[in-house]
Amino acid sequence: RCSPCFTTDQQMTKKCYDCCGGKGKGKCYGPQCICAPY
């Protein structure tokens, strides 16, 4: 499960991406990363 995310974090996109296993893109919809195959 992803750690809490913050839209103010410049690295959040990468963190969510890594959290989602690098598949598709992990996007931050505070307060959590959403793993969607965009």
From Swiss-Prot:
Its main location: secreted. Pfam families: Toxin_5 (PF05294). The keyword DNA damage does not apply. The keyword Transferase does not apply. One of its GO terms (molecular function) is chloride channel regulator activity. Keywords: Chloride channel impairing toxin, Disulfide bond, Ion channel impairing toxin, Knottin, Secreted, Toxin, Voltage-gated chloride channel impairing toxin. Expressed by the venom gland. InterPro entries: Scorpion_toxin-like_sf, Scorpion_toxinS_Cl_inh. It is found in: Secreted. One of its GO terms (cellular component) is extracellular region. Disulfide bonds join 2-19, 5-28, 16-33, 20-35. Belongs to the short scorpion toxin superfamily. Chloride channel inhibitor family. Toxin with unknown function in healthy organisms. On glioma cells, interacts with chloride channels (probably ClC-3/CLCN3) and MMP2 at the surface of glioma cells. This complex is then internalized via caveolae, thus inhibiting the chloride channels necessary for cell shrinkage and tumor propagation. The presence of a 'disulfide through disulfide knot' structurally defines this protein as a knottin. This is Toxin Lqh 8/6. It comes from Leiurus hebraeus (Hebrew deathstalker scorpion). The lineage of its organism: Eukaryota, Metazoa, Ecdysozoa, Arthropoda, Chelicerata.
